[in-house]
Structure formats: structure tokens, C-alpha cells
């Protein structure tokens, strides 16, 4: 008889749940003020015109308009919202 209980094979078989990060509204989509455009960790995408940035780096629309993804540097990208004209 074993004097210790056998270790199960599931001891290391855990995984954390997904954080639901990523782009929520894509380029060309219409957004209303307050709509979340991107959820991200850090500023992988920077805030451009008519968008705000939350304390958790979430980018959201400040006005009603159309989402546009742009480059403002060789390596950096930003997202802006432009009103329908």
C-alpha cells in the first residue's frame, strides 16, 4: 500500500480565461460616441482624432462617425474617428 496519495495528472492542467482583447470596431465601420473601438494592453495602437483613451488603454469614440486606422510613424499606428460629412 502506498503511504502517500498518488499525484493526479491534472495538477498542471490549468489555463486562464481569455481577456476578450482586440479590435471591436473595424476600419470603415460607423460608431457612436462612447463605442469601444479597441481593447488592448498598453498602447499598441495610439489614439488619434476624436477618440479617447481609458485608464486600461481602451480606445473609444468621442463623436459619432467612421473609424479609420492610420500610420503616423514608420512603426506606430493610430485610430481616428471622422464625422460623416
UniProtKB/Swiss-Prot annotation:
What HAMAP family does the entry give? Ribosomal_bL27 (MF_00539)
Q: What name goes with this protein? A: Large ribosomal subunit protein bL27
**Gene Ontology MF terms in the entry:** structural constituent of ribosome
Asked if the Swiss-Prot or TrEMBL record annotates the protein with the keyword Ribonucleoprotein, the reply is yes
Q: Identify the GO cellular component terms for this protein.
A: cytosolic large ribosomal subunit
The answer to whether the entry has keyword Cell division is no
Family statement drawn from the similarity comment of this UniProt entry: Belongs to the bacterial ribosomal protein bL27 family.
Q: Which UniProt keywords apply?
A: Ribonucleoprotein, Ribosomal protein
Q: PANTHER family given for it?
A: LARGE RIBOSOMAL SUBUNIT PROTEIN BL27M, RIBOSOMAL PROTEIN L27
Entry's Gene Ontology BP terms? translation
In terms of Pfam families, this protein maps to:
Ribosomal_L27 (PF01016)
InterPro entries with a match to the protein in the record: Ribosomal_bL27, Ribosomal_bL27_CS
Q: Which gene encodes it?
A: rpmA
Amino acid at each position: 500500500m502506498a503511504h502517500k496519495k498518488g499525484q493526479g495528472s491534472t495538477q498542471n492542467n490549468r489555463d486562464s480565461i481569455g481577456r476578450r482583447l482586440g479590435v471591436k470596431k473595424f476600419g470603415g465601420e460607423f460608431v457612436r460616441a462612447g463605442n469601444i473601438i479597441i481593447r488592448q494592453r498598453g498602447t499598441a495602437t495610439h489614439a488619434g482624432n476624436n477618440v479617447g483613451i481609458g485608464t486600461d488603454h481602451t480606445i473609444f469614440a468621442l463623436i459619432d462617425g467612421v473609424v479609420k486606422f492610420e500610420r503616423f510613424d514608420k512603426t506606430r499606428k493610430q485610430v481616428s474617428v471622422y464625422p460623416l460629412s
